Amino acid sequence: MSNPELPIKFTDSAASKVLSLITEEENPALKLRVYVTGGGCSGFQYGFTFDEKVNDGDMTIEKQGVMMVIDPMSLQYLVDGEVDYLESLEGSRFVVNNPNATTTCGCGSSFSI
């Protein structure tokens, strides 16, 4: 069930993968941090890391007992987007489906607005 008040979606697939990775690490304090930095072939790029901290101003979304964290600067580029986890012949990875991106590169990790 989705919450229409949240500015970004955290899919079941992404939450399940985060739960699996956290279980492997044996550290339940870990959270998935999603961020945007300058760089990549289109101007901005997405980043994913595990973090134990939630900083002042961070937005958090909890699903399936795990938490996704986004800093306020990155959130402005991700509003109405979706963080998902895909498995395909090309490999498996976390992705951001971002309706604000006007251009994305072939790998999907770089975008422009």
UniProtKB/Swiss-Prot annotation:
Entry protein name = Iron-sulfur cluster insertion protein ErpA
Lineage runs:
Bacteria, Pseudomonadati, Pseudomonadota, Gammaproteobacteria, Alteromonadales
Q: What does this protein do?
A: Required for insertion of 4Fe-4S clusters for at least IspG.
- Example GO biological process term? iron-sulfur cluster assembly
Using the record for this protein, list the coiled-coil segments as residue ranges, or answer none. Answer: none
Q: Which cofactor does it need?
A: iron-sulfur cluster
User: How is the cofactor bound, as the UniProt entry phrases it?
Assistant: Binds 1 iron-sulfur cluster per subunit.
Sequence positions that bind iron-sulfur cluster: 41, 105, 107
Q: What Pfam families has UniProt attached to this entry?
A: Fe-S_biosyn
Going by the entry's taxonomy, the superkingdom of the source organism is recorded as: Bacteria
What does the record note on quaternary structure? Homodimer.
HAMAP family from the UniProt entry: Fe_S_insert_ErpA
Q: What are the disulfide bonds?
A: none
A single Gene Ontology CC annotation of this entry is:
cytosol
Return the Gene3D superfamilies for the record.
HesB-like domain
Which family, according to UniProt?
Belongs to the HesB/IscA family.
